[in-house]
């Protein structure tokens, strides 16, 4: 179990929908500090969160997840002045725009990776940090393909690949930072939007999706926090239909373990 009591949490996402509902649940867990980094101001949401737990300090910064890493460093230098340290980093920024592949990939994958690369040194035990947990909020179509939202699905597959790679013991044994992902199923805030398919052949399906049964943002947010509390390094969870399910990970390339062992053995030989 991962105890959130007293933790300093940094949430990178728009403070609405799933992110807002997740933050509401976090505020009931006696966290000490919550930093929210999002693209637009939402003072009503911040006030709503603060009313749940007045003793928890909430900080807000406008943040563009697609900015260059050099700019991110400036932001997080400022964030650390207020936060002192980060125990939990949650990446929740998302975009589904099949007409704008670059923006979709930059928001969902590249921006998330740059954010993680920027924050990791602050959390790394060998660099003066205390370790902690990185949570990548992603989608079930990062596990199974979507013939309708091809660009979105590709970006979410990338999130899963990045999560599993960064969670490898090669890193975790040294930096003490666990990495996990939560894959959300169809959720009301997503399907309420006007959705465009990657190719016109899939548009009728995209239109019908808006009428499909979906989980609420509040239930999804609750299960994201449940997954965090139950998390172990490298785990992938599915939050869908009001439930929470642990993904059984599978290795398709059977030489993967041997290859990593070979690289580690060569490193040890070089040190000798």
From Swiss-Prot:
> Sorted alphabetically, which keywords does the UniProt record give?
Oxidoreductase
- CDD domains recorded: ADH_SDR_c_like
A single GO cellular-component term from the record reads: cytoplasm
Matching PROSITE patterns: ADH_SHORT
MF-aspect GO terms: oxidoreductase activity
Q: Which Pfam families match?
A: adh_short
Superkingdom of origin: Eukaryota
Task: Name the family the entry cites.
Answer: Belongs to the short-chain dehydrogenases/reductases (SDR) family.
Q: Which PANTHER family match?
A: 15-HYDROXYPROSTAGLANDIN DEHYDROGENASE [NAD(+)], ALCOHOL DEHYDROGENASE-RELATED
Q: What is this protein called?
A: Alcohol dehydrogenase-related 31 kDa protein
Organism lineage: Eukaryota, Metazoa, Ecdysozoa, Arthropoda, Hexapoda
Q: Name the encoding gene, please.
A: Adhr
